[in-house]
Amino acid sequence: MPRYRAIAEYYDHENERLDWLKRDVPFLLRHLPRRPQEVLELACGTGRAAIPLAEAGHHVVGVDYAADMLRIAREKRDALGVSPQNLQLLRRDVSRLKLRRRFDWVVILFNTFLGFTTLDAQDRVLRVVREHLKPGGRFWLDIFQPNLPLMASERSTRIDPSAFYVPSLARTVYMDVDVRRDPSKQLQEVTFNYKWFDQHGQPRRQRTRFDITFIFPRELQILLERNGLRVRKMWGDYDGSPLGADSPRIIVMAQPA
């Protein structure tokens, strides 16, 4: 995704404000067996999930296409003393991945799957998942559940004003997000706007845009089934509550059919 290549240095710091991102990995870890598992994380980014999975004793392969994100992940891994043998980081296109090995678990977190906005792209990713799972393996997918009142609105909105400090750049960055929705296409255009001040006090700006789709629970189940994956369980939040109409998340554990 282009935005991650553009602002990788911001990524961890801008997301510290999101409380739910402190709960998704612990919830996943509670469902992994205690004995070491072979785990493939697709779109691992800066290692936010891959590193704690490896620290818990699992053997993790993290894949991402953004070289700068992987650079930060390697720096964090090495600083924490996590062995490259326990956490291997690869630059690959996750929709065309061929590792010639299979895993106990394949995971896609943090709404990443929604960045694949066409049926063809979604099918390609799910085929990759199926091809890399061992018989009886598990697929873990975590996306937000669509908010129908928001989906019905085509107007642009500006949300999430915030500020964060980036130590590597010695810079405080001010951020807000523009969102434009097209319910007829189930698409959402998201633009992140960043502003900071240079050493002369002059404002500098950066903007990056990407599209995501909306997927409803039944749609997701159909997508999984037509790609050889059977849903074992669905949750609606990280407290383990079942998926319902008002649930904020769609968390799925599936396995090869």
Predicted segments with their positions:
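Class I SAM-dependent methyltransferase SAM/SAH-binding core
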Residues: 50-96
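A short acidic, Gly/Pro-enriched loop at the edge of an enzyme's catalytic core
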Residues: 98-105
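Conserved class I S-adenosyl-L-methionine
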Residues: 1-45
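A short glycine-rich, Lys/Arg-flanked "PGG" loop and its adjoining helix->strand segment in the class I
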Residues: 123-135
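C-terminal lobe and adjacent flexible extensions of AdoMet/dcAdoMet transferase-like proteins
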Residues: 211-257
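Conserved beta-strand signature within the Rossmann-like core of class I S-adenosyl-L-methionine
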Residues: 136-143
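SAM-dependent methyltransferase
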Residues: 143-221
